[in-house]
């Protein structure tokens, strides 16, 4: 468990992550224009929401990685964890560390995404600000000893944003701008 000081910690703003989320929200505005709409794009959005949130985050990051709720063949585990990384809620190692910290100190000062401080923090703040105690490499390592040596998870940790751009280009090639707008931005 991180040792928290009584002094309010100095948070570091992550311009890259914040810029990425601004880019996503600005891109989402294109959904209001007819040239960025297709029913196949809507179907893609619904499918990706299920795949990234339900399978990737809930099943992969949460049940499988955080709580070790099951044993899976390596290729299945890697597939669902990859799907979780596409949700853009951080890479698997940091997400798991933060969630384990959350369970260790739910809604206290030891919770990295407690709603007690603000409505903003648990929804996006914890991802765009680096907290000196929760995001310290040694603390992350301490909470993720069972997964942090996995090379594939390390790759996803470093590249989950880049993977969005690769997926965006694939969607552009297959379904045009509507697939990018509805498959990436929304």
Residue ranges, per PLM feature:
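Non-catalytic, topology-defining segments of multipass membrane proteins
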Residues: 1-186
């Amino acid at each position: 468990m991180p040792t928290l000081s009584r002094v309010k910690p100095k948070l570091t703003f992550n311009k890259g992550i914040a810029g990425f989320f601004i880019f996503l929200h600005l891109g989402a505005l294109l959904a209001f224009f007819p040239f960025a709409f297709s029913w196949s794009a809507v179907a893609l959005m619904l499918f990706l929401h299920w795949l990234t949130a339900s399978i990737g985050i809930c099943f992969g990051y949460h049940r499988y990685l955080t709580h070790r709720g099951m044993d899976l063949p390596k290729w299945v585990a890697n597939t669902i964890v990859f799907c979780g990384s596409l949700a853009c809620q951080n890479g698997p190692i940091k997400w798991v560390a933060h969630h384990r910290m959350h369970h260790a100190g739910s809604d206290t000062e030891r919770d990295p995404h407690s709603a007690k401080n603000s409505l903003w923090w648990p929804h996006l703040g914890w991802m765009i600000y680096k907290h000196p105690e929760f995001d310290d490499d040694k603390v992350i390592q301490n909470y993720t000893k069972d997964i942090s040596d996995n090379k594939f998870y390390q790759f996803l940790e470093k590249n989950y944003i880049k993977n969005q751009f690769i997926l965006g280009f694939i969607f552009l090639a297959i379904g045009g701008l509507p697939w990018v707008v509805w498959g990436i931005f929304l």
